[in-house]
């Protein structure tokens, strides 16, 4: 039975799921908005929000924790130099999910997940090809 087990399986084993969310978190930090399915967007919130909270206090230990979770030095740099200071006064809720219809191929519900307060110049990036 799966009583009280949190998180979605998304028809993947744990290593595939971990790698997928690591890649998606990196894409979201880099581009500040990505398009994905609603279920993946809701799960991605649980990965990205703690990373941004970690980036609010810049220390070597926190940078190492962020690197352990993302495995990307560029993403860690952006987290601690741009996103941490940007959300210093916000006590959580750094992402927004906007539903955007159904995917043409399989009618899966799609959504944009974006960082709140992002600069408007950032354009949406479709990460479905990467999956």
From Swiss-Prot:
This is Large ribosomal subunit protein bL17. Belongs to the bacterial ribosomal protein bL17 family. PROSITE patterns: RIBOSOMAL_L17. HAMAP family: Ribosomal_bL17. Transmembrane segments: none annotated. Keywords: Ribonucleoprotein, Ribosomal protein. The keyword Ribosomal protein applies. The lineage of its organism: Bacteria, Pseudomonadati, Pseudomonadota, Gammaproteobacteria, Alteromonadales. Gene3D superfamilies: Ribosomal protein L17. InterPro entries: Ribosomal_bL17 (IPR000456), Ribosomal_bL17_CS (IPR047859), Ribosomal_bL17_sf (IPR036373). It comes from the Bacteria. Part of the 50S ribosomal subunit. Contacts protein L32. GO terms for cellular component: cytosolic large ribosomal subunit. One of its GO terms (biological process) is translation. It comes from Shewanella baltica (strain OS155 / ATCC BAA-1091). One of its GO terms (molecular function) is structural constituent of ribosome. The gene is rplQ.
